[in-house]
């Protein structure tokens, strides 16, 4: 029986770095042969111009997306949930909700950060500091580059970095 992974990651559209990495993972024959995989694209934007903009349609899509993630985690029962959170911006509160719901279901969560922004956003917003603390608590983190570690060292010990 192959280990099960639920990938919650951005894939195109829109096309940007994290979405391209998500597409590479999704299309990887090695990953798909070694693991039983399910994929959920949490993206709410169809173009780069819409990234970071809030609309009523996006709010409803986000709720639907979160319910889909919870349902998939409950039914598929993955051994691991791979999640690509936003590094900065108000999307961290969505990430907090998703990661918390996965942890409540006793799912092992690994986060993959693709860029910086955690430190600067948390320094400017008190509730962001609390959110990041909860998001990173008891999770392992994959960093795209070791130079990203100072951005999250306040929240994640080096022993939980891959």
What are these regions (language model features)?
Residues 65, 80-105:
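An aromatic- and histidine-rich active-site surface loop
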Residues 131-162:
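Donor nucleotide-sugar binding/catalytic pocket of nucleotide-sugar-dependent glycosyltransferases
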Residues 76:
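Active-site charged/polar residues at nucleotide-handling catalytic sites that mediate phosphoryl
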Residues 41-71, 87-94:
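A short, charged, and often flexible helix/loop element on the N-terminal side
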Residues 1-45:
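N-terminal subdomain of nucleotide-sugar transferases
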Residues 3, 105-109, 139, 158-159:
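A short helix->loop->beta-strand "cap" motif at the edges of active sites that frequently abuts
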Residues 86-91, 107-125, 140:
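A short, histidine- and acid-enriched strand-loop-helix "catalytic/donor-clamping" loop
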Residues 7, 39, 83, 111, ...:
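Structural beta-sheet core signal
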